[in-house]
């Protein structure tokens, strides 16, 4: 490429401005020497204007295609920047806590305790202990909408509270099960242990239950580590300590087993299984952990489409996991529609009123709104970036009393007992890494591939464009201005018009320029 140090008069077009002339000259130089495919043919002197136009059109179409593909790459990068990779299928399970185990009696209250406590209370006029016991099923109105409860029933239970100066929570404390009334014998990690050392009374969506290794406000987190295999799991003999328990009348003969993350509130979101009495049940657990790479942690919430536990605050629950957010929405709707929330959601984090029997009709009537069946009552609950999932497989067998076993754990079992074994079925577990689908290097590589495929551009081509339309453009502009100045300084020939020109009222100068 050669650039003239001085332009001849024939190379200067006085019909356009110096800037336009220098731009045109720079464009011609760029097309003649550019590495971009097709541009040189748009200024080929050996072809006509039709060929020039065709090549210009082809180059323009190819450039548009490159831009469209590059935009597609960028949109994909922004809309779905992450992916899941299996980091390991054999991570040692002893790096995890043992999965939280919650055991809930399938009947809300210990009837033997309830009868004894009601004998100490002043009962409403015209009623007796048997009537009150039959009305205890009204507590299901705090949880479900299966039944409509009459105003007479709710008023009767309200009067029971007021006559004895009791709150609903105090009444529940005297009626509920204790853990030693459900759990007869426990074994963990191969050793028989006191059940009350392992299990603590917890609040759940199903009322009061007994939980092991659960992190909940008011509980001491035992932080027991996991070990693979049946021998090192948790075994429990289940036996109701309630002489008044009638499985026919209660329509139940067993307990609920709930397994979820240690920070999650036990609820319908948990992995729930029914453990029947007069059987031996084996619950084999396979954990799966999802965690994030440092690159994903550095992304914004909008880009990774998930949150960490300290990034999303809730009113009624301390620790953020997705099930807790759904329940937080449920409690919020309770307060919104009924101005109270149920007793098992009381963690002393707010001053909201606790629902009593008089609020049950409101809770039942607004059940669809409370559990967010309608879009208008749904809440925003982002997914958690890091979490543990538990796949629970159940195997159950009839309980054999006369089977010769040398294990002291089985001594003294009764025919109506239930035996539960919860264990991790492998010494290793799967870890999934939430990683970047592509980083900035990959994005730049994809963009470069698009432009290279269609127009043959590279980063060097970008530098070339910048060079031509800065350095070379300035040089051409200076040459253009100098050439025009020299043409004017050579003194063009001109003539004055005659003084008696009748076609003009004012004297005008008419320049007649002759080419030199």
Curated annotation (Swiss-Prot):
GO CC list: plasma membrane
Keyword Transport found: yes
Topological relation to the membrane, as annotated: Multi-pass membrane protein
Keywords, alphabetical: Glycoprotein, Ion channel, Ion transport, Membrane, Sodium, Sodium channel, Sodium transport, Transmembrane, Transmembrane helix, Transport
Stretches of the chain found on the membrane's Cytoplasmic side: 1-49, 474-516
GO molecular function: ligand-gated sodium channel activity
Subcellular location: Membrane
Residues annotated as transmembrane: 50-70, 453-473
GO terms of biological process kind: liquid clearance, open tracheal system
Keyword NAD: no
Glycosylation sites: 128, 165, 220, 348
Record topology, Extracellular segments: 71-452
Family from the record: Belongs to the amiloride-sensitive sodium channel (TC 1.A.6) family.
Record's function text: Part of a complex that plays a role in tracheal liquid clearance. Probable role in sodium transport.
Protein's name according to its UniProt entry: Sodium channel protein Nach
Organism of this sequence: Drosophila ananassae (Fruit fly)
Gene this protein is translated from: Nach
């Amino acid at each position: 490429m050669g650039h003239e140090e001085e332009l001849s008069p024939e190379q200067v077009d006085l019909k356009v401005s110096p800037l336009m002339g220098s731009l045109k000259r720079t464009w011609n130089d760029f097309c003649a020497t550019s590495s971009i495919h097709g541009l040189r043919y748009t200024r080929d002197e050996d072809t006509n204007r039709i060929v020039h136009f065709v090549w210009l059109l082809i180059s323009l179409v190819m450039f548009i295609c490159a831009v469209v593909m590059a935009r597609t790459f960028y949109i994909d990068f922004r809309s779905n920047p992450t992916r899941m990779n299996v980091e390991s299928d054999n991570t040692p399970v002893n790096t995890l806590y043992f999965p939280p185990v919650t055991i809930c009696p399938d009947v809300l209250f210990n009837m033997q305790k309830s009868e004894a406590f009601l004998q100490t209370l002043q009962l409403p006029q015209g009623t007796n202990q048997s009537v009150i016991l039959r009305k205890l099923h009204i507590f299901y109105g705090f949880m479900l909408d299966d039944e409509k409860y009459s105003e007479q029933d709710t008023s009767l239970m309200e009067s029971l509270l007021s006559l004895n100066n009791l709150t609903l929570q105090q009444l529940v404390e005297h009626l509920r099960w204790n853990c030693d009334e459900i759990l007869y014998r426990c074994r963990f990690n191969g050793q028989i242990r006191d059940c009350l050392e392992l299990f603590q009374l917890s609040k759940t969506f199903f009322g009061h239950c007994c939980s092991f290794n659960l992190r909940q406000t008011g509980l001491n987190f035992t932080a027991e580590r996991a070990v693979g295999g049946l021998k090192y799991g948790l075994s429990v003999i289940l036996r109701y300590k309630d002489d008044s328990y009638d499985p026919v009348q209660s329509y139940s003969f067993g307990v609920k087993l709930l397994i979820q993350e240690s920070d999650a509130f036990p609820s319908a979101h948990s992995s729930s299984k029914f453990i029947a009495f007069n059987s031996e049940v084996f619950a084999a657990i396979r954990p799966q952990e999802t965690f994030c790479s440092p690159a994903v942690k550095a992304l914004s919430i909008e880009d990774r489409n998930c949150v960490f536990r300290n990034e999303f605050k809730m009113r009624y629950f301390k620790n953020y996991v997705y099930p807790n957010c759904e329940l937080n929405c449920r409690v919020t709707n309770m307060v919104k529609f009924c101005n109270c929330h149920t007793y098992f959601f009381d963690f002393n984090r707010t001053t909201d009123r606790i629902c009593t029997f008089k609020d049950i009709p409101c809770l039942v009537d607004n059940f669809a709104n409370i559990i967010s069946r309608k879009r208008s009552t749904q809440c925003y609950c982002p997914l958690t970036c890091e979490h543990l999932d538990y796949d629970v497989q159940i195997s159950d067998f009839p309980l054999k009393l006369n089977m010769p076993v040398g294990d002291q754990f089985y001594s003294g079992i009764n025919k109506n007992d239930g035996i539960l074994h919860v264990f991790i079925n492998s010494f290793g577990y799967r870890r999934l890494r939430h990683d970047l689908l592509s980083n900035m290097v990959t994005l730049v590589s994809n963009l470069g591939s698009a432009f290279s495929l269609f127009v043959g551009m590279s980063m060097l081509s970008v530098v070339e464009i910048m060079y031509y339309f800065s350095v070379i453009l300035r040089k051409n502009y200076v040459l253009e201005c100098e050439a025009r100045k020299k043409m004017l300084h050579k003194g063009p020939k001109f003539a004055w018009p005659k003084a008696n020109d009748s076609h003009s009222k004012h004297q005008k100068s008419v320049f007649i320029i002759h080419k030199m």
